[in-house]
């Protein structure tokens, strides 16, 4: 039977509950336990698929096509266990399911209320299909005190009472701010946060205290006394130099030992931290460095590209180099020459995005990379813009454009009206809803024998990658573009949808319709990112 660990947050948002959950899961996993991580989001959206990247950050897509919170990316990267649509739920989804049942008459005329109907739905989600795991870690989004989070806190309060004694614990992540004028860490915000939790019936078992310095023994004692936890359960969560040092830091602070003690479990053995030690050694002592320009639309919000920046870091780990990121707003290139911004970089990456804003800037970035022989990696929208650039400047199709931006005489990129999903054919139109209507999840692609991308994948001729797009390169232009050197080296199994393009006479120029960053891990860097960074290393030696 699985045991449950509920991770809550207090004082301020963005403290790192997702990283804390992922790191704790990795520590338990390294001790030989099977873990599952789930995220409960209190917002009313059905999923983050249509939310602004500036508000929510990245949308993380799973193999089974769920659009989820970016924290699931942390879970996958730290534990290696692929997340599914069953690992993320929102208030909006819960309400939709409840109201659908109410319309069908499933509740037999009962009055639908937050308690018990909403809380029961949350409990069912948390407790479902966990028999194969030793620990289930559930992160509650937001902070204690948020109105929209109250049903979730009530649900996890009930779960601890419903389960046998010792089968569930609460870990509360909080902030210990340092006040320079007073010269001390302040515990009062944490005390008030715990007071708020206790007022709704939840007593934390462990306090995980974010701080930039060591917690003095007296402050640790005070926290234990006023928050009603053991002094040993006041865990110091010190700031670290990179996120992959978090498991090491939490283990050194005794978090995993304290969790097992809270369950009354004798530790099986010390966790196997060798792989984490190797990764952090490479990060802290690189043998060189490269600079990659990310030319995107949402560069003001780094979390919009969370998996992307982490995948580039993984590429650096694979090549034992530090990857410096130069974030450039693509709109800049619509009015200015890209050369002054890009001449110093060793690689250019144009990521995914939606809409016309900044598109011409991405096209100019692709042109610069092609003409200057700078390694170029185009992902999703970045591949589409590279194809439009080739059509305009190599194939002489001056009007080449995407129907996403409006009607065009030369639709190099157009809306996918239908595609196969398993054994079913899905169809879309311009008039349809935006939410949940993209080509989502893992799809296969066939690679051309002898192509660069096949070589990158170790000679593979078939791959599976995650997608999130509703527009696709038009295969009607394939022959004309290939005559000018742009090779369509990857296609869907039916040959209809272009998946990968590349230039054979370029040091490294690859565009992919999928999102390889979603499957990259620190221990298993995605081959495309490892190869891209390797090409950037070669380019850096030529400058």
Curated annotation (Swiss-Prot):
<feature type="binding site">
    <location>
        <begin position="146"/>
        <end position="148"/>
    </location>
    <ligand>
        <name>CTP</name>
    </ligand>
</feature>
<comment type="function">
    <text>Catalyzes the ATP-dependent amination of UTP to CTP with either L-glutamine or ammonia as the source of nitrogen. Regulates intracellular CTP levels through interactions with the four ribonucleotide triphosphates.</text>
</comment>
<dbReference type="InterPro" id="IPR027417">
    <property type="entry name" value="P-loop_NTPase"/>
</dbReference>
<dbReference type="InterPro" id="IPR004468">
    <property type="entry name" value="CTP_synthase"/>
</dbReference>
<keyword id="KW-0479">Metal-binding</keyword>
<dbReference type="GO" id="GO:0044210">
    <property type="term" value="P:'de novo' CTP biosynthetic process"/>
</dbReference>
<keyword id="KW-0315">Glutamine amidotransferase</keyword>
<comment type="subunit">
    <text>Homotetramer.</text>
</comment>
<dbReference type="InterPro" id="IPR033828">
    <property type="entry name" value="GATase1_CTP_Synthase"/>
</dbReference>
<keyword id="KW-0547">Nucleotide-binding</keyword>
<feature type="active site">
    <location>
        <position position="517"/>
    </location>
</feature>
<feature type="binding site">
    <location>
        <begin position="186"/>
        <end position="191"/>
    </location>
    <ligand>
        <name>CTP</name>
    </ligand>
</feature>
<keyword id="KW-0436">Ligase</keyword>
<dbReference type="Pfam" id="PF06418">
    <property type="entry name" value="CTP_synth_N"/>
</dbReference>
<dbReference type="GO" id="GO:0003883">
    <property type="term" value="F:CTP synthase activity"/>
</dbReference>
<feature type="binding site">
    <location>
        <position position="13"/>
    </location>
    <ligand>
        <name>CTP</name>
    </ligand>
</feature>
<feature type="region of interest" description="Amidoligase domain">
    <location>
        <begin position="1"/>
        <end position="265"/>
    </location>
</feature>
<dbReference type="GO" id="GO:0005524">
    <property type="term" value="F:ATP binding"/>
</dbReference>
<feature type="binding site">
    <location>
        <begin position="14"/>
        <end position="19"/>
    </location>
    <ligand>
        <name>ATP</name>
    </ligand>
</feature>
<feature type="binding site">
    <location>
        <position position="71"/>
    </location>
    <ligand>
        <name>ATP</name>
    </ligand>
</feature>
<feature type="binding site">
    <location>
        <position position="353"/>
    </location>
    <ligand>
        <name>L-glutamine</name>
    </ligand>
</feature>
<comment type="similarity">
    <text>Belongs to the CTP synthase family.</text>
</comment>
<feature type="binding site">
    <location>
        <position position="139"/>
    </location>
    <ligand>
        <name>Mg(2+)</name>
    </ligand>
</feature>
<dbReference type="Pfam" id="PF00117">
    <property type="entry name" value="GATase"/>
</dbReference>
<feature type="domain" description="Glutamine amidotransferase type-1">
    <location>
        <begin position="291"/>
        <end position="542"/>
    </location>
</feature>
<keyword id="KW-0067">ATP-binding</keyword>
<feature type="binding site">
    <location>
        <position position="470"/>
    </location>
    <ligand>
        <name>L-glutamine</name>
    </ligand>
</feature>
<comment type="pathway">
    <text>Pyrimidine metabolism; CTP biosynthesis via de novo pathway; CTP from UDP: step 2/2.</text>
</comment>
<dbReference type="InterPro" id="IPR017926">
    <property type="entry name" value="GATASE"/>
</dbReference>
<feature type="active site" description="Nucleophile; for glutamine hydrolysis">
    <location>
        <position position="380"/>
    </location>
</feature>
<feature type="binding site">
    <location>
        <begin position="381"/>
        <end position="384"/>
    </location>
    <ligand>
        <name>L-glutamine</name>
    </ligand>
</feature>
<feature type="binding site">
    <location>
        <position position="222"/>
    </location>
    <ligand>
        <name>UTP</name>
    </ligand>
</feature>
<feature type="binding site">
    <location>
        <position position="222"/>
    </location>
    <ligand>
        <name>CTP</name>
    </ligand>
</feature>
<dbReference type="InterPro" id="IPR017456">
    <property type="entry name" value="CTP_synthase_N"/>
</dbReference>
<dbReference type="GO" id="GO:0004359">
    <property type="term" value="F:glutaminase activity"/>
</dbReference>
<keyword id="KW-0665">Pyrimidine biosynthesis</keyword>
<feature type="binding site">
    <location>
        <begin position="238"/>
        <end position="240"/>
    </location>
    <ligand>
        <name>ATP</name>
    </ligand>
</feature>
<feature type="binding site">
    <location>
        <position position="404"/>
    </location>
    <ligand>
        <name>L-glutamine</name>
    </ligand>
</feature>
<feature type="binding site">
    <location>
        <begin position="186"/>
        <end position="191"/>
    </location>
    <ligand>
        <name>UTP</name>
    </ligand>
</feature>
<feature type="binding site">
    <location>
        <position position="13"/>
    </location>
    <ligand>
        <name>UTP</name>
    </ligand>
</feature>
<dbReference type="GO" id="GO:0042802">
    <property type="term" value="F:identical protein binding"/>
</dbReference>
<dbReference type="InterPro" id="IPR029062">
    <property type="entry name" value="Class_I_gatase-like"/>
</dbReference>
């Amino acid at each position: 039977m699985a045991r449950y660990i509920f991770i809550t947050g207090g004082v301020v948002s963005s403290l790192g509950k997702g990283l804390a959950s992922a790191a704790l899961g990795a520590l338990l996993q390294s001790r030989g336990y099977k873990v599952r991580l789930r995220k409960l989001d209190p917002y009313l959206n059905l999923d983050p698929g249509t939310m602004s990247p500036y508000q929510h950050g990245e949308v993380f897509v799973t193999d089974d096509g769920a659009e989820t919170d970016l924290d699931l990316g942390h879970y996958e990267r730290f534990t290696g266990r692929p997340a599914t649509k069953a690992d993320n739920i929102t208030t909006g989804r819960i309400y939709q399911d409840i109201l659908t049942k109410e319309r069908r008459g499933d509740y037999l005329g009962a009055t639908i209320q937050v308690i018990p109907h909403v809380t029961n739905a949350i409990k069912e989600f948390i407790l479902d299909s966990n028999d194969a795991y030793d620990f289930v870690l559930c992160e509650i989004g937001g902070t204690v005190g948020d109105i929209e989070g109250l049903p979730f806190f009530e649900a996890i309060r009930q779960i601890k009472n419903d389960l046998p004694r010792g089968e569930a614990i609460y870990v509360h992540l909080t902030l210990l701010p340092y006040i320079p004028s007073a010269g001390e860490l302040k515990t009062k915000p944490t005390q008030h946060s715990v007071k708020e939790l206790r007022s709704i019936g939840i007593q934390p078992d462990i306090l995980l205290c974010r701080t930039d310095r060591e917690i003095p023994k007296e402050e640790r004692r005070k926290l234990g006394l006023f928050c009603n936890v053991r002094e040993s359960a006041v865990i110091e969560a010190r700031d670290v130099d990179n996120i992959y040092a978090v498991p090491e830091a939490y283990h050194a602070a005794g978090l995993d030992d304290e969790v097992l003690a809270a369950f009354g479990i004798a530790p099986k053995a010390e966790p196997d931290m060798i792989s984490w030690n190797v990764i952090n050694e490479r990060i802290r002592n690189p043998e060189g460095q490269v600079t990659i320009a990310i030319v995107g639309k949402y560069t003001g919000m780094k979390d919009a590209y969370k998996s992307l920046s982490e995948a580039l870091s993984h590429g650096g780990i694979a090549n034992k180099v530090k990857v410096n990121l130069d974030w450039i707003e693509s709109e800049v290139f619509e009015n200015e020459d890209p050369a002054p911004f890009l001449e110093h970089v060793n690689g250019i990456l144009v990521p995914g995005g939606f809409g016309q804003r900044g598109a011409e800037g991405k096209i100019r970035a692709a042109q610069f990379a092609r003409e200057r022989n700078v390694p170029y990696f185009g992902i999703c929208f970045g591949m589409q813009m590279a194809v439009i650039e080739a059509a305009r400047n190599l194939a002489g199709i001056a009007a080449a454009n995407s129907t996403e931006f409006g009607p065009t005489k030369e639709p190099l990129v157009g809306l996918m009206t239908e595609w196969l999903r398993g054994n079913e054919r899905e169809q879309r139109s311009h008039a349809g809803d935006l939410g949940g209507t993209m080509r989502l999840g893992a799809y296969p692609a066939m690679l051309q024998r002898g192509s660069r991308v096949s070589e990158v994948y170790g000679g593979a001729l078939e791959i599976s990658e995650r997608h999130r797009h509703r527009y696709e390169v038009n295969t009607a232009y394939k022959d004309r573009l290939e005559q000018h050197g742009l090779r369509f080296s990857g296609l869907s199994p039916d040959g209809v949808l272009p998946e990968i393009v590349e230039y054979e006479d370029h040091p490294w120029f690859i565009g992919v319709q999928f999102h390889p960053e979603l499957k990259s891990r620190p221990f298993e860097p995605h081959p495309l990112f490892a190869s891209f960074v390797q090409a950037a290393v070669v380019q850096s030696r030529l400058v």
